[in-house]
Amino acid sequence: MKVVLPDGRIPRRWYNILPDLPEPLDPPLDPETEEPIDIEKLKRIFAEELVKQEISRERYIEIPGELRKLYSKIGRPTPLFRATNLEKLLGTPARIYFKYEGATVTGSHKINTALAQAYYAKKQGIERLVTETGAGQWGTALSLAGALLGLKVRVYMARASYQQKPYRKTLMRIYGAEVFPSPSENTEVGKRFLKEDPNHPGSLGIAISEAIEDVLKDEKARYSLGSVLNHVLMHQTVIGLEAKEQMEEFEEPDVIIGCVGGGSNFAGLAYPFVKDVLDGKSEYEFIAVEPKAAPTMTRGVYTYDYGDSAGLTPKLKMHTLGHRYYVPPIHAGGLRYHGLAPTLSVLINHGIVKPIAYHQTEVFEAAVLFAKAEGIVPAPESAHAVKAVIDKALEARREGKEMVILFNLSGHGLLDLKGYEDYLDGKLEDYEPRDLPVKS
């Protein structure tokens, strides 16, 4: 059972949650002065239109027609499926639906904001985009966006994933991007981390630092970010806006679930539904799932911290493990991040979103079960959501109650098979930090 919308139903506007948050965000701070940052400084890092979107109080922002055509080209609208085989396998009265972002040409949700960021950079006359990537999904998406819009792309890929997922690197290179393992010898930041540990596995925080250092050396370059900031999460709301329309063909969800690293795929599905809760129109349960190896939501502190490991970015008020937190080399590379989207942090603080965490072994076990039932191999990141869905469906079975579950299957795992191989061979290790000193 599935619903596929026609091209003409691609959303015409993104949803911006800022005007609807239960409290306003605290302003980002200048890393040098610790005062609210001058917006003009952000324009040296990001494309100007993205800076405007980041602080906009408009509830809906129009998606340019040219960009909607590109969305169609890469596979939007994406399908929404009912997981009937999984329901039968679990023997649950719950009905399970998933929005499948793996149907895009790059295999994940990341292309939704990659195209938007590249589009606005091109309009401004920017020639080169530089970014970080964890598992490689974001780097792949920006590489294709650059190819489609005529921009050069350079990607700093967390070294653990660079080694675990060599074909992601190959795919980025096919699309024309330069790819460096991070930490690298390409930047002063990278050299410093390599001096501390020549075999450093890297992290999203370190890769962000390298990308920003790179950008600041080139006036014609700008930084593109794959998660965390509001404009990135806003671009992803095409997922939830489509899903709301598709679920009208089925039924109203009770529970909405997504995995979380920085927060973009969770927000993409959930925020259009969160609006209904904030407006008092509906009651949904929102579950955000993270790895126990990077327990930002479940064990982090809500405070100002840098978005990168070297302290080059503005400080954001968010849930954080501390920007120098050593993130273990789990296979869900896209979730190896110390911080969290400020907007999602606020929703967690107000009890609107419930966070939970799992070990990677139990996550891969759930992913294999899902693959056997539905035929789709989830990305290791998305598999965290699958684990939560299965647990919720089993809860419904124990309590003998009907329940409608909607989750975001944010990407496929066909280029992440080393993690699955390690799981099947009994080689996966679980990581959970004992102490989490946060130094902002």
From Swiss-Prot:
Carries keyword Lyase? yes
Q: Which InterPro entries match?
A: Trp_synth_b-like, Trp_synth_b_CS, Trp_synth_beta, Trp_synth_beta/beta-like, TrpB-like_PALP, TrpB-like_PALP_sf
Which pathway, metabolic or otherwise, does it act in?
A: Amino-acid biosynthesis; L-tryptophan biosynthesis; L-tryptophan from chorismate: step 5/5
| Keyword flag Amino-acid biosynthesis | yes
- Keywords in alphabetical order, please: Amino-acid biosynthesis, Aromatic amino acid biosynthesis, Lyase, Pyridoxal phosphate, Tryptophan biosynthesis
What Gene3D superfamilies does this protein's entry cite?
Answer: 3.40.50.1100
**How does this polypeptide assemble, per the annotation?**
Tetramer of two alpha and two beta chains.
**Purpose:** The beta subunit is responsible for the synthesis of L-tryptophan from indole and L-serine.
Name of protein: Tryptophan synthase beta chain 2
Question: Could you tell me which species this protein originates from?
Answer: Pyrococcus abyssi (strain GE5 / Orsay)
Name of the gene this protein is made from: trpB2
